[in-house]
Amino acid sequence: MRLLAMILSLAVSLAMSAGLSAAEKFKALIVDGQNNHNWKATTPLLQKHLADSGLFIVEIATSPPKGGDMQAFKPDFAAHQVVVSNYNGEDWSPATQAALVDFVRSGGGLVIVHAADNAFGKWAEYNRMIGLGGWGGRSEKSGPYLRFRDGKIVRDTSAGRGGSHGKQHAFEVIVRDPQHPVTAGLPTNWMHAPDELYDRLRGPAENIDVLATAYSDPATGGTGEHEPMLLTISYGQGRVFHTTLGHSPEAMKSVDFIVTYQRGTQWAASGKVLDASVPSDFPGRDKPSVRE
């Protein structure tokens, strides 16, 4: 059954690819080079997932290693429709920071994957772009927590650290905005493969839409709160899709990660989701679904 699902998904992707010329595909740039996670293993998956959709031409910009000359790191953001950050490391040069801000503010797309929301804790505009972040010196001074309580998202301004997680485990993701193009047509809830469940993220949380949450269970070291998992943020004329999922290569092979990442990157690039198909191996509430 899983093999059939993969074949059908590939057939849809090939059909989409056949219908688009190279000039019509979105140009995506994945940024990596430093991370406290295994970016050398996860960037190829992020590239593959986009390429498999048939909708993207993907390039990679790799920064110098820690301690290297960051002044020389000058990705050409403007040559692309969307930038995917798999980066969590040393500060970029002021010129490169300004180039990303200008790119997104002028209508470009940005995708934040997992630990990319740990980066640049002191960079004010980055924190506005990503909405919420963790670690990097973040605290109540960075902005509120967002929690889903009593049927709505609330802003919790209580004092405390920014960013934590319990033990890796499989958990249920619950859609909170089923009308958004990224989540439209997906099940209202599903099981995600074992992953870090980020909690206590905080930040400016301006122009933000929480698409999905997960319960951070105290039994696994969590907060006892329903925490944001999938977010969108409007920044100037640009669009940001922020997924807190994807700690490991295994987590990035979870079908729900693949589908929401593909959809979120389409939306960030264009404001639309061109391929809103739901593969037959998309997980339900009973167990995760992982592709090999």
Pin down the residues of each PLM region.
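Bacterial N-terminal signal peptides
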Residues: 5-17
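Boundary at the C-terminal end of the N-terminal hydrophobic targeting segment
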Residues: 17-23
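Helical hinge/lid and interdomain linker segments adjacent to catalytic or ligand-binding clefts
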Residues: 23-120
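Extracellular ligand-binding/catalytic regions of CAZymes and related secreted enzymes
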Residues: 23-26, 41, 52, 75, ...
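Catalytic beta-strand/loop cores that center a nucleophilic Ser/Cys/Thr
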Residues: 51, 57, 147-236, 278
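A glycine-rich, often tryptophan-bearing local segment used as a flexible ligand/cofactor-contacting loop or short
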Residues: 90-181
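Structural detector of well-ordered beta-strand residues that form the stable sheet scaffold
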Residues: 107-111, 211, 241
